[in-house]
Amino acid sequence: MVSKEYSRIGETLHHAELENGLHIYVDVKPEFSKSFAFFATNYGGMDMRFKLKGEWHDTPAGVAHFLEHKMFDTKDGNALQDLAANGASPNAFTSTAITGYYFESTEKFEENLK
C-alpha cells in the first residue's frame, strides 16, 4: 500500500492496486462517527457497446441501469435490505459514464463491507 500525505489538510490517503487491477483508496478519519464505502465502475448509460475476446457486442439502452439493480440481487433476496437490516444506509446510481454503489454506517462497517 502506498500512502500520500496531504499536509495542508492534515490527511493521508492510502492506495493499493489488487492483482485484478482494482484500485483501493482508504482515507482514515478517526474523528468521524460514520464510515463510508464507495465502489464505482467505468460503465454507465453511454456504454452500449463493448469488446469481449476480440468481438464487439451491442446492448440496448438502459443496460447499465438494469445491471445496477441486478447487482443487489442475492440468493436470499436483496443486498440493499440486508445492508439496511445491518444498520447501513446503502444506495447506487448510474450516470452517463459510471455506475456507483455506496453505503454509510456507524456500526458493523467491516461486516457490511463483506
Residue ranges and their predicted role:
Residues M1-A79:
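His/Glu-rich zincin catalytic helix
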Residues D58-P60, H69-K114:
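Active-site-adjacent, His/Asp/Glu-enriched structural segments that form or flank metal-binding
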